Amino acid sequence: MSDDTTQIEPAMAQETSPRANTRKVFVKTYGCQMNVYDSQRMADSLAAEGYVATDTPDDADLVLLNTCHIREKASEKLYSALGRLRKMKDARAADGKELTIGVAGCVAQAEGQEILRRAPNVDLVIGPQTYHRLPNALARVRGGEKVVETDYAIEDKFEHLPAPRREETRKRGVSAFLTVQEGCDKFCTFCVVPYTRGSEVSRSVKQIVAEAERLADSGVRELTLLGQNVNAWHGEGEDGREWGLGELLFRLARIPGIARLRYTTSHPRDMDDSLIAAHRDLRQLMPYLHLPVQSGSDRILKAMNRRHKADEYLRLIERIRNVRPDMALSGDFIVGFPGETDQDFEDTMQLVRDVNYAQAYSFKYSPRPGTPGADLDDHVEEAVKDERLQRLQALLSAQQYAFQDSMIGRKMDVLLEKPGREAGQMVGRSPWLLPVIIDDNKDRVGDIIHVKIVSTGTNSLIAQKLA
């Protein structure tokens, strides 16, 4: 799952008849797809309380920043944003008006009270496992409290969240995220997720199917299942047997209206036979897999506590491509992990050449407080990290462009997601996740049409519709 602090304002319902006491909320999302999903579920909770969305903080009564803690810059972005909001809140106060500021997500979980100390203008801090308590927390804020809501028991937050209204789901489009698993038990030495999201927890089949059916009923055609280690999902199936993600995908594929399935993010250790069989047999499962490896060096993989070797990863890729030859691979890489030598880095470059990625995310290592990696010695100099990252990204970019060029002349089905920038233009999604731009003024959002790729754009494909 990419954690490159993509910033998204999630769609929320707009009321059709404004009320005098309507409260407006602005939600900003930093980070991964799961944060986007969490923002949408918080939006559902707030909609049930009478909040309506605004696309700017300028006229909001409540501003929520849903944060990411994977990398240091994400925290820096949060405090920079809070500094700007402080000025806005002070200006409101001078006019006798109020602005409530809330911090949600993984930085909220990791820093808790520290956020209130560093940014006293914040009214509410709420973690990713406690946002089902958001309406109650806001009521306490209106009563004059400063609220930090990060302690959670073994309880199912999804049982406490209202189902999204059909009209709200429609506004979000024909592709949707659905969280099926949260937390992580792998404890990679560079990663904060086990400390901010907790242990691995799988949602029940009943919950997942019910939410997927609601989404399909609202016009969703493509579902992306989310989890920190999504392929670690397991649970009792409808037949009484223990299911893994493969069996769950087969069940979701039976839901009328769901034409496409994806999942992210996976761990190599949890790619089992049933999941590989799903890639072989399930036509709705798209041929695109995000499977992070982080390094091509066995020595660094061991230091990272990744629990697999580079050759095991490569053999797994071979197994997957044997059953799905058109599979496109995406990955994550960290350069400059403590102790990484020139040879370790060259091993990573060789693995990248061996796999030939369609897309990948790469970052310089930055120590995260509280992780074992932060206590390691032999840190790599920043200049060396920079040079290695440039070399790696150049190779990955070349592979990505080559993958896009390989699409030219191919025929494929494309799911139309939205109108394009130009009149009569539509933007869809290829099976390999790339946006596809088509001159088409007859088909509608949600249609799946057959096209031929004629050229490439910037991270996109240009297509002609086929009869």
Swiss-Prot record:
Domain TRAM: residue ranges: 405-467
The Radical SAM core domain, residue ranges: 170-402
Domain MTTase N-terminal span(s) in chain numbering: 23-143
One Gene Ontology molecular-function label: metal ion binding
Record-listed [4Fe-4S] cluster 1 binding positions: C32, C68, C106
Stretches for region Disordered: 1-20
Keywords: 4Fe-4S, Cytoplasm, Iron, Iron-sulfur, Metal-binding, S-adenosyl-L-methionine, Transferase, tRNA processing
Reaction catalyzed: N(6)-dimethylallyladenosine(37) in tRNA + (sulfur carrier)-SH + AH2 + 2 S-adenosyl-L-methionine = 2-methylsulfanyl-N(6)-dimethylallyladenosine(37) in tRNA + (sulfur carrier)-H + 5'-deoxyadenosine + L-methionine + A + S-adenosyl-L-homocysteine + 2 H(+)
CC cofactor: [4Fe-4S] cluster
Binding site for [4Fe-4S] cluster 2: C184, C188, C191
Enzyme class (EC, first level): transferase
Family annotation (Pfam families): Radical_SAM (PF04055), TRAM (PF01938), UPF0004 (PF00919)
Chief site of localization: cytoplasm
Highest rank taxon of the organism: Bacteria
Entry's EC annotation: 2.8.4.3
Cofactor info, note text: Binds 2 [4Fe-4S] clusters. One cluster is coordinated with 3 cysteines and an exchangeable S-adenosyl-L-methionine.
Family per record: Belongs to the methylthiotransferase family. MiaB subfamily.
Subunit and interaction comment: Monomer.
HAMAP family xrefs: tRNA_metthiotr_MiaB
Protein name: tRNA-2-methylthio-N(6)-dimethylallyladenosine synthase
Protein's gene: miaB
